[in-house]
Design a protein with these regions (language model features):
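Short beta-strand-loop/turn "lid" adjacent to the catalytic site in phosphate-handling enzymes
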Residues: 63-100, 126-135, 164-185, 208-211, ...
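Short, acidic/turn-prone active-site loops that include or flank metal/cofactor-
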Residues: 31, 98-105, 178, 263-265
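N-terminal glycine/serine-rich phosphate-binding loop of ATP-dependent small-molecule kinases
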Residues: 1-95, 107, 124, 152, ...
Length: 389
């Protein structure tokens, strides 16, 4: 029996899935980890948490599925996009990673547009405007605000590609995820030498870029021992979380569109050609399908808003869920169902980490509007769900 593992490096946790060639799911496991916000608008994680979560979730999947390690024939990776992992000459993490929903880089976005020769020129180079969530502004932020750390940087990786590095020892990425760095020539599916030169970012700091289905390396002996797998298992390029999800949803041909919700909320459309929004309101990236592209819009705090609500106001439901052996979101959803559609005039604005689509504003903030004495917990829970959708 041939078994394949998919490892997704999410914002709230890492999920590993084991499937057969037929698509039958044998087992899954999720390991959660923290997110740090040392200042308003900042969002960081420790890359070591991703690696520990990946290793633990793989071991759990093998155990739960009763899977023989020798049956595992390949590993695919997906994950949260745009995050910046800075490594030194020894391949060690220099500081916590800045995430996709981090909003500290407004000044760096302006700097990028200026260096590129204006917003229109930038979009002409990489098909997208400079947005605070993207990777390139984070690189400039490190250079501008932590020069002592920037001087130590020898490699810059995306979240899933850091896990790839720990699995294979290879510095590698793939086109769908690399598109979200703002440093990829999306048309050519290669790093933009022109923009890198204008930003004075050394090309050797960036990894080799593969197509998503290409083998990017094989499992090292050290990683294999930790995961409980044989050495030499191929690890393919994989994809950014949205591109990988789109393939799973069948969004691989002209005219197909998906709407999905995780921490963020995304509308994703396949394209056979490069489709560029001159206004920069939506993103144009390489698809994880060779020779194809996609356009997408992203609301930063969709499911993330409901997670925030659970953490801040759902302690009773979380305790009850633990006692019952169910997911706390199940109880919160039942609670929300007690309020009518529209939450009787209570509205939630889900701008907990700024916003990206259709109004790119890192300073946007969330709010409840329309509160009255009539509103109870069911209204608040439902309003968060409605505001995020």
């Amino acid at each position: 029996m041939s078994v394949y593992l998919g490892i997704d490096i999410g914002t709230s946790g890492t999920k590993t899935l084991a499937i057969r060639e037929t698509g039958e799911i044998l087992a899954s496991a999720t390991v959660e980890y923290p997110l740090y916000s040392p200042h308003p608008g900042w969002s960081e994680q420790d890359p070591e948490d991703w690696w520990k979560g990946s290793a633990e979730s793989v071991r759990l999947v093998l155990q739960r599925g009763g899977i023989s390690p020798e049956d595992v024939k390949g590993i695919g990776l997906s994950g949260q996009m745009h995050g910046s992992v800075f490594l030194d000459q020894d391949g060690k993490v220099i500081r916590r990673a800045l995430l996709w929903n981090d909003q500290r880089t407004a000044q760096e976005c302006a700097e990028i547009e200026e260096r590129a020769g204006g917003r229109e020129a930038l979009i002409g180079m990489v098909a997208n405007p400079a947005l605070t969530g993207f990777t390139a502004p984070k690189i400039l932020w490190l250079r501008n605000h932590e020069p002592q750390n920037y001087e130590r940087v020898r490699q810059i990786l995306l979240p899933k590609d850091y896990v790839r590095y720990r699995l294979t020892g290879e510095y590698a990425s793939e086109v769908s995820d690399a598109s979200g760095t703002l440093l990829l020539d999306v048309k050519a599916r290669a790093w933009s030498k022109e923009l890198l030169s204008k930003l004075e970012i050394a090309p050797e700091l960036l990894p080799k870029v593969y197509e998503s289905e290409e083998v990017s390396g094989t499992l090292t002996s050290a990683a294999a021992e930790l995961l409980g797998l044989p050495a030499g298992v191929p690890v393919v390029g994989g994809g950014g979380d949205q591109a990988a999800s789109a393939i799973g949803n069948g969004i691989v041909s002209r005219g197909t569109i998906s709407a999905t919700m995780g921490t963020s909320g995304v509308v994703f459309a396949h394209s056979d050609e490069v489709q560029i929004d001159a206004g920069g309101r939506i993103h144009t990236f390489c698809h994880a399908v060779r020779g194809k592209w996609h356009v997408m819009g992203c609301v930063l705090s969709a499911g993330g808003s409901f997670q925030w609500y659970r953490n801040q106001f759902g302690q009773a439901e979380s305790s009850a869920a633990a006692a019952m052996g169910v997911d706390p979101y199940e109880l919160l959803t039942k609670q929300a169902a007690n309020a009518p559609a529209g939450s009787e005039g209570l509205f939630f604005l889900p701008y907990l980490t700024g916003e990206r689509t259709p109004h790119a504003d890192p300073n946007a903030r969330g709010a409840w509007v329309g509160m009255s004495l009539r509103h109870g917990k069911s209204h608040f829970a439902r309003s968060v769900m409605e505001g995020a959708t």
